């Protein structure tokens, strides 16, 4: 078995090292991660300049001067002679639930695997800081082992959020849907030394839909949340209404 491991916090992140150690007994691991923290990079590819790949003398991890998506893209199309059995991303320093998944570099690294036909799992630790990182890595390894032993059909993309709790306090796994957040906080305006305005992106909004069945509800209740995602963004319930709308518009002229 071979696993491609990446993240969005960068190749020096504690979450990456912990996940690597937890997965080593399960498969051959190739690590390819961003050089810098790329939180919020989403599925961006670097097209304006060439990318370079380096290798850490300390860990053997490969890293690229680009995004999480770049990392997986380069590994799959430029380094590996055969497809890995699984792409794994994480462990992220902070949750990726609800709307977070659209911005998340952690989820994006996993998504890039799916783009090339490789099943993928993204792992995030709810709440920042690494208080129970070892416990989260243990859970992640259990989920990966279960997938390798009992693969899901097709090419699944799983988004996993692990409560920041001791292993013994976790209540188990729950399959969930994405919740929803309130809009993010307004940007924070400041002034640079030259008197020019600069802006910091505001904090993410609080949970809007944290009802039972959502990732927010599961993790708040002490469960590991597993949400199956898909690449098809088509709003199927809007197709009929949109056809009627387009038909009326094209006939109006």
UniProtKB/Swiss-Prot annotation:
Cofactor(s) it depends on: a divalent metal cation
Cellular component GO terms held in the UniProt record: cytoplasm
UniProt source species: Burkholderia pseudomallei (strain 668)
Protein name: 5'-nucleotidase SurE
Protein task: Nucleotidase that shows phosphatase activity on nucleoside 5'-monophosphates.
Positions that bind a divalent metal cation: 8-9, 39, 92
Main location: cytoplasm
HAMAP family: SurE (MF_00060)
Record key words, sorted: Cytoplasm, Hydrolase, Metal-binding, Nucleotide-binding
Cofactor binding annotation: Binds 1 divalent metal cation per subunit.
Family to which this protein belongs: Belongs to the SurE nucleotidase family.
Enzyme nomenclature, EC number: 3.1.3.5
One Pfam family hit: SurE
Location(s), subcellular: Cytoplasm
Molecular function terms, GO-annotated: 3'-nucleotidase activity; 5'-nucleotidase activity; exopolyphosphatase activity; metal ion binding; nucleotide binding
């Amino acid at each position: 078995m071979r696993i491609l491991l990446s993240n969005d916090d960068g190749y020096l992140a504690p979450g990456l090292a912990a996940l690597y150690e937890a997965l080593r007994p399960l498969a051959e691991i190739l690590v390819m991660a961003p050089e810098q923290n790329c939180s919020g990079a989403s599925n961006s590819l670097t097209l304006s300049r060439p990318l370079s790949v380096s290798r850490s003398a300390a860990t053997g991890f490969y890293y690229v001067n680009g995004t999480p998506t770049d990392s997986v893209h380069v590994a799959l199309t430029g380094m590996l002679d055969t497809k890995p059995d699984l792409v794994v991303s994480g462990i992220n320093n902070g949750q990726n639930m609800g709307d977070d998944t659209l911005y998340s570099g952690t989820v994006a690294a996993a998504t890039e695997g799916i783009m090339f036909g490789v099943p993928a799992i993204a792992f995030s630790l709810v709440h920042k800081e690494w208080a129970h990182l070892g416990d989260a890595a243990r859970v992640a390894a259990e989920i990966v082992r279960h997938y390798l032993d009992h693969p899901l059909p097709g090419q699944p993309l799983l988004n996993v959020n692990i409560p920041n709790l001791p292993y013994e306090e976790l209540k188990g796994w729950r399959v969930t849907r994405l919740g929803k957040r309130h809009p993010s906080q307004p940007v924070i305006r400041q002034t640079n030394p030259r008197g020019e305005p600069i802006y910091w992106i505001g904090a993410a909004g609080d949970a809007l839909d944290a009802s039972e069945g959502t990732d927010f509800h599961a993790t708040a209740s002490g469960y590991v949340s597993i949400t199956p995602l898909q690449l098809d963004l088509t709003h199927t319930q809007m197709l009929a209404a949109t056809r009627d709308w387009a038909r009326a518009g094209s006939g109006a002229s």
